[in-house]
Amino acid sequence: MKVLLSIILTLFVLAGVGPSFAQAEPPGFTNASRISTAGDSELPQVFASGDGIFAVWTQSSLGKSDVFFSKSTDGGYTFGSPVNLSESAKGQSLYPQFVEKDNHVYVTWQLSLSGVSTILMAKSLDGGTSFEKPIQLSDGSQLSAFPQIALSGNHVYSSWIEKSADNSTNIIFAKSDDQGNSFGVPLHMTHNVGNSGIPKLSSDGNQVYLAWEDNSRGDYEIFLSKSSDSGTSFHVPVDMSTTTGQSGTPEVIVSGNNVYAVWMDNTSGNYDIFFTKSTDGGDTFAKPVDISHLKGDSGYPQFTVWKNNIYVTWTQTISGTNYDIFFAKSSNNGDTFDKPINLSNNFGPSGWPKIASDGNIYVSWVDSTPGKFDVLITKSTDSGATFENPTNLSHSKTESYENEMAALDNTVYMVWQEGASGNHTIVFSKSTTFVPEFGPLASVALVLSIGSIIVVSYRSSLKLKI
């Protein structure tokens, strides 16, 4: 099992062949429609609320890249003209993240220019109709990358990775108490000689939670620190993983006084998916449990929480050339988990799952079984006991990947990128009746290595054996 001991600060993007666009309307979904404009558009994000459907992505042309934003006010049937938030004269604006609540939209990204990398943020207080000029959150003294953002009332929180002069990486936190008009001096959450990475930021009322992976003790562990005063001060970090193996790629969800976390861990010799929870606001955590227990490596988990149900999905190695999407659920707030089930279970490699729930459960992933990489999705209406046959959303002539998903009121909103290297577009589709495809997908030869999907986990130092 190879463990890379440095945080990877570059994203390896999948390469496709030829121009692309979705060709057939998938059952139960609208035709995939293009929401980006000219240029090479990648890394889409999507969010759905009662205020609208919001999307951001990066778009490259003429040697530079910018962050773009678009919004739909009619449930995703149409989108407004994309707005360039960064408007960089030069340099690369990358890795956008955003939040929206009550028509307040905050978008953050990384700007790389002349060997310097800084964190910027733009905000809109009118639902994305207009945006203020971006402000710089990092101090510019070190390389800063991979920002996160969270929102609670008038408080806006951000965290990112900073590379120090000794090549170690640390976690930085900054906050605003005035709706993002101004930010305080960035706070170093870690001061390690090793590497800290993959910050995950959450907030709930006055509580702020920040988790990350960290090898300052010699092996990678998952730490969490919380603030009870809106980010003014933080408690001593808690080691959530407490295992003897390497732990990485954390995901954290906060729901009231409950804090849930999943990650990948190789204590058993292979990577497995571990889960822990806190019922006292993150002060203490239960002993981590292995919820995968499968042969081969399990990695890159995603999960969601709906009432007392915990739903987890991940990429599972089946053989040296095949990967599938697995799912496990808990119906008792994470006290126990059912045996994992295989959602993709097909001939081609499947990877990079996303999951959402609005009572129903939706899992999407990238799959090469149709003959090239397409975006597939499945749904459960019985709390994960059974799933419908997967639906192919993209049906594109070239490659589709980097899928992101939002669910609201029994409707699923999907974005992804498709096309050739250097010529990608961002497309959108929403569910209508969600009638599944029936019958097995055709068995076809593998056209791209699943390793291309796996390396998209660019912020983690842990990698599955490929």
Regions inferred by a protein language model and the residue ranges of each:
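Secretory targeting signatures
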Residues: 1-25, 173, 261, 275, ...
